[in-house]
């Protein structure tokens, strides 16, 4: 009998000067970037949290703490690949990932196809098992004021 689990992840980072904006493993031209210990890829962090949560392994901070210099500036695609490996070691497979980027600016639509391809590649799944979309908050809240960017992700994992 096939066992299935669902995971949910959420992440948010503040926008700051003098940082590159990396979302979904894609560098997006913008005057500010996300602050963080790693590359601050809010989308990949939310996906990592969803996958880790589905397996019952806590969250990204437990596995890749911001107090560990080894993760300073690290490409979050590396973190996602490591999470995927942890699933594989426990005989779990990714059924699908559905994620939403929450940002007033910049526009994400031109970059979503590349983000989706990176995520599918890093997880070792077909591209149709990954969905990435973006929305604004109609200028409401921290994202609407351009203070930061958030992302949410849900995943289904299966084994057996």
Curated annotation (Swiss-Prot):
The coenzyme or cofactor needed here is: a divalent metal cation
The protein's site described by Transition state stabilizer is found at 37, 136
Identify this protein by name: 2-C-methyl-D-erythritol 2,4-cyclodiphosphate synthase
Co-factor: note: Binds 1 divalent metal cation per subunit.
Entry annotated with the keyword Aminoacyl-tRNA synthetase: no
Instruction: Tell me the superkingdom of the source.
Output: Bacteria
Q: Name one Pfam family in it.
A: YgbB
Q: Which UniProt keywords apply?
A: Isoprene biosynthesis, Lyase, Metal-binding
| PANTHER family in UniProt | 2-C-METHYL-D-ERYTHRITOL 2,4-CYCLODIPHOSPHATE SYNTHASE, CHLOROPLASTIC
Enzyme class label: lyase
> Which positions in this protein are listed as binding a divalent metal cation?
11, 13, 45
E.C. code: 4.6.1.12
Tell me the organism's taxonomic lineage: Bacteria, Pseudomonadati, Pseudomonadota, Betaproteobacteria, Nitrosomonadales
User: Gene name, please?
Assistant: ispF
């Amino acid at each position: 009998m096939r066992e299935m689990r669902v995971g949910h992840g959420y992440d948010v980072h503040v926008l700051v000067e003098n940082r590159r904006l990396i979302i979904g493993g894609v560098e997006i031209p913008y005057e500010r970037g996300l602050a963080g210990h790693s590359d601050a890829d809010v989308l990949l962090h939310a996906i990592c949290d969803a996958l880790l949560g589905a397996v019952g392994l806590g969250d990204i901070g437990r596995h890749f703490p911001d107090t560990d210099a080894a993760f300073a500036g690290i490409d979050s695609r590396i973190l996602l690949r490591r999470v995927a490996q942890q699933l594989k070691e426990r005989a779990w497979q990714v059924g699908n990932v559905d994620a939403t980027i929450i940002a007033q600016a910049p526009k994400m639509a031109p970059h979503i196809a590349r983000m989706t391809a990176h995520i599918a590649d890093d997880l070792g799944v077909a591209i149709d098992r990954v969905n990435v979309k973006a929305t604004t908050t109609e200028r409401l809240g921290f994202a609407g004021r351009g203070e930061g960017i958030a992302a949410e992700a849900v995943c289904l994992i299966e084994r057996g």
